[in-house]
């Protein structure tokens, strides 16, 4: 079973970005970066990396303030290209939030710019996020933003939160949540 990694701030607590990337492999177009794309069963998946400091440096060995995250210009240009290629439905994965109705400290600084790119492309159906340990759901202009609850809140099994997701043939998003992650059946925009 292939594994895909979405880099988060806790991944950079004690190791460098380069060390993390050298010990993992992501199928698809990783290009030695923590942002990349891949296609599974006719669905394009885009993984974004917002682990950047205000000065543009990447999070590295604890050199960051977890309340600041941004998607840099180079990655935005790559994202524009990815959004314009192909005709598959798109699912996006990112650690920090792109939502609007959550505390600013858990959001990407340039979230509105990223959301507007998604909103201009009807193929973007859902964004899966982390970082906000409580979890969250929000629909913004027809796109679903689902924040999976944190799985680092304790050592007991109920904290091992995850979800199995399916885009069905009718275009619905089926989220089969485990433990603290709620189940959802969501209609997608056309």
List each language-model region with its residue ranges.
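Short active-site segment of divalent metal-dependent hydrolases/proteases
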Residues: 11, 98, 134
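Charged helix-capping and loop-helix junction motifs
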Residues: 106-114
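Metal-dependent active-site segment of extracytoplasmic phospho-/sulfohydrolases and closely related
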Residues: 124-130
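Secondary-structure transition/turn motif
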Residues: 177-183
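Short acidic, glycine-rich surface-loop motifs adjacent to enzyme active sites
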Residues: 83-102
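Extended active-site neighborhood of metal-dependent phosphoesterases/phosphodiesterases
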Residues: 1-81, 85, 113-124, 137-176, ...
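Active-site glycine-centered loops adjacent to acidic/histidine catalytic or metal-binding residues
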Residues: 8-9, 95, 130-131
């Amino acid at each position: 079973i292939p594994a895909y990694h979405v880099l988060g701030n806790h991944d950079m607590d004690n190791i460098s970005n380069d060390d993390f990337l050298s010990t993992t492999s992501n199928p698809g177009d990783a290009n030695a970066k923590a942002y990349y794309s891949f296609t599974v069963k006719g669905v394009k998946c885009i993984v974004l990396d917002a682990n950047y400091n205000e000065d543009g440096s990447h999070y590295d060995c604890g050199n960051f303030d977890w309340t600041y995250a941004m998607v840099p210009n180079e990655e935005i240009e790559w994202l524009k290209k990815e959004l314009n290629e192909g005709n598959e439905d798109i699912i996006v994965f990112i650690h920090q939030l792109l939502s609007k109705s959550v505390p600013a400290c858990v959001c990407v600084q340039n979230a509105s710019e990223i959301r507007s790119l998604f909103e201009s492309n009807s193929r973007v159906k859902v964004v899966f996020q982390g970082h906000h340990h409580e979890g969250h759901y929000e629909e913004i202009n027809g796109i679903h933003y689902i924040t999976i609850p944190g799985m680092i809140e304790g050592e007991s099994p109920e904290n091992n939160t995850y979800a199995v997701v399916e885009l069905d043939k009718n275009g619905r998003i089926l989220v089969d949540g485990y433990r603290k992650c709620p189940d959802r059946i969501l209609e997608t925009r056309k």
